[in-house]
Structures are given as C-alpha cells and as structure tokens.
Amino acid sequence: MSLTQSAKLHIIHQSIGKITTRLYDTSPFHGDSHCKQRRVKDNCIQFNMNISNVLKCYSEIESFSINQRIRRSISLFLSILRSFYSMRMRLLDLFITSSIPVAKILLITGIGFYLALDQVNILNHDARKQLNNIVFYVFSPSLVASSLSETITYESMVKMWFMPLNVLLTFIIGSFLGWIVIKITKPPSHLRGIIVGCCAAGNLGNMPLIIIPAICNEKGSPFGDPESCEKFGLGYIALSMAIGAIYIWTYVYNLMRMLANPAGETAINSTSSTMPLISPKVEVAEQVGTWGKVKQRVCSVAEKINLRTIFAPSTIAALIALAVGLNPLLRKLLVGNTAPLRVIEDSVSLLGDGAIPVLTLIVGGNLLNGLRGSGINKSVIMGVVVVRYLLLPILGVFIVRGAHYLGLVTSEPLYQFVLLLQYVVPPAMNLGTITQLFGSGESECSVILFWSYALASVSLTVWPTFFMWLVA
C-alpha cells in the first residue's frame, strides 16, 4: 500500500529530526573503518537508514506542489548534514582527548618542580644528578629493551620500515632548522649545541607513551577498539623510542659535543699547523696524495667521536632487544606468558616502568632553574619553539602524506598518526641528561625546556586534533 503525500512528508520531518539529534548525541563516525565499536556501528546504521528514508520519500513526491527553493534548501541541508557526519569529527571531543595526556605530564612535572623547591629540598641538584644516572644506566635501557622485545618481529619490521627513516628525517630537518636559528639569533658558542639538539631531538619516549593510550581509551577516538589501538600503538611507540634513543646517543650527542667545543677544534688545528716546525716527519706527510688526506680526515673525525657514547646503555639495550625479537628461539625463551625465562623479561619490564615518572620528575626539578632565569636571549627560545611546534609539524604533514601517496606508508590511521606525532613532540628529556654529563649549559637548557613544555600543552592539543581529523 503506497503512502500518501502527507505521510511521506511526516516521514521526512521525523527523519530530519533524528539526523539532527544524532549529530549531537552520537559519535560522528561512519563506514566500516570507523564503526568498530558496537554503539558507534549501530548509530551509523541507523543514520544511514534515516538518510535513505528521506531520499526515497523525497524522490517520490515530485508531483507534490512544493516551492522549488524549499526543495533545493532541504536537499542542500541534507547534503550538509551527511557531509558533516561523514567527514568531520567533533572538534571538542578531540580537543579534550588530546589535552588529557598533556595534563598528566604537566601534573607530574609540577610535582617534580615542588620537590625541587628550596623549602622542600628533596629533589635538589645532587638528587637530580643521581637520579639522572639511574635513568641513564638502568631505567631507560630497561624501558627500551622491554618495549621493543615484546613488539618487534620480522612482520612488524617489514610493516614499519618507514618509521626509522621518518625519525631520521625529524632529526636531520630539525638540525638544519636549528642551524638557521643559530645564524639568525647569533647565540654564544656554548649554546649552539643545545639549540641544535633541542631542534633535532624530540621526546619520542614518554610523551607518546602517555598520549597514545590516553587517546585510544578516550570516547570519540578514531582508532577503533581501545585494546587493539593501545596494543599496536605501544608497539609503534616502542620502535620509535628505540630508534630515537639510538639517534640521540649517536648523532645528537656527538653533534652537541662538537658544536659546544669549537675551542678544542681550534687548538687541534693550531697544533697541527706548528708541527712542521718541530717534526721532520711532516715533510713526508706533505707529499701524501689525496687518499692520504682523506684518510687523515677520517681518522680525525673518528678521534672526535667517542664510541662509548655511541654505544650508550639505551643503544645496547635496543640492539639486544632487536636480537631477541627477531630470533624465534630467544623470543620463545624470554618473551610471552609461557616463556621459560619470562622472569627476566618481567624484571626488565618492571625496571622500565620507572623511567617515565622519574624522567618527568627530573624535568620538573630542572624547570626550577628555568624560572630563576639564566640570561638566555628570548629570540633563542622563540626560535626553538617555532621550529618544534610550527615548522616541523607542517613539514611532517607533507612528508607523511606524501609517503602515503607514493605507497611508502600503509593506510592504517594509527600508524600514520604516530608518524605525524614524531614531528610535534617537545625536545627530548635526554637533552637534560646530556647537558648534565657535559657539566655546562644546564641552566640554559632548563630555560628552553621550561618554555617548550609550557607551550606543549597547546601544541600537543591542537596538532594531534588536526592529525586525527587528517588520518581518520
């Protein structure tokens, strides 16, 4: 039995009301890739049924005398609603989702700041130095080893092959932008290494480890089931953290050391220039050809690079974890609930759990020096902030989306989100460890870290919101 025209109009009226209500009351995702949770899937199905009813009834009442403008307005209204529902996520939900992990970091940092006050004097300079050594030699290597060994396999290595290249690009591009900041601001020589380090090395460890689980477990997350999201997300972060640790202690550490000690290089060059007046052996060296000069240059660079810093504890832990994860026999012995030697892996994992809170407390204590000031130029701080929170994220969007367009990156939203997140994190906390190992620049580094992490609450809310919309 066919419906009357008035009945059809009544169905249209009810359906439009239901659609409008669901725009505010339901999670705005559609399609198989986003409707993974039962509640969201039901809402998507009901929404599509409402749309179908409206369009079907609307197409059958052509003979009904409705003004053409009204019909076009209704059609345009329905198109806008459907487009909004299918292509846009609720920005308020995403804003809240991405701001929660930042609030956690700031809260723990505030506790570290309080413990470092002179009135409390629990986390004083000596205490931070000792804790820093414990993190460097125990906590951080344990965290890298446990996270990487649990998640790394041949299959995951093939799937995530672009991630090491992506992290390397963040370091290289950041170094280049840091060099531009140095040329513009003209800071003292002892600050050059700190500036380049802050622009190059991002916090690929505890920041993403807090951000990803928080986003996965929040209502409105575009990454599907919370358990699967957290499992795969932590796997991506573990590899990112391990690669970042290797780059920091091989590339950034030696780069900061060489940039911070130009006087030592001058002394070496000066000594070599006076050697012909003292040693007759140089006369033979002057006759050496191009190959000899290249060999001398390689030896000179090798002398400047300290192998002990390249093979830092975190680097060694990453190499061991790779060997365990990629070797099926070792993996069966050490990793998993049924592994005979799982007590070793559990103990390492337990030690690694202390890395994030202790590192965050140390940063909070170091920020106290930043508040007291060190006479650092404001343009230097502004340059680092612009590089880390504006230029790098913009370039990261083009790199990751370009790689996806070329087929170098899979279409998985969570994987792309982690790749994008690597461009927007604040400077690495290990930079504070490096400056303390150098014994200089701690105050200036604390100032930069203070303002970087203070503004991270804005950057790590705005950019992840945009990234989630971009990849969803």
UniProtKB/Swiss-Prot annotation:
What keywords does the record list, in alphabetical order?
A: Auxin signaling pathway, Endoplasmic reticulum, Membrane, Transmembrane, Transmembrane helix, Transport
Q: How does it sit in the membrane?
A: Multi-pass membrane protein
The residues exposed to the Cytoplasmic compartment are 115-133, 183-193, 253-309, 369-379, 435-446
Q: What is its main location?
A: endoplasmic reticulum
Which Pfam families is this protein grouped with?
A: Mem_trans
**Job of this protein:** Involved in cellular auxin homeostasis by regulating auxin metabolism. Regulates intracellular auxin accumulation at the endoplasmic reticulum and thus auxin availability for nuclear auxin signaling.
The protein's name in its UniProt record: Protein PIN-LIKES 1
Protein species of origin: Arabidopsis thaliana
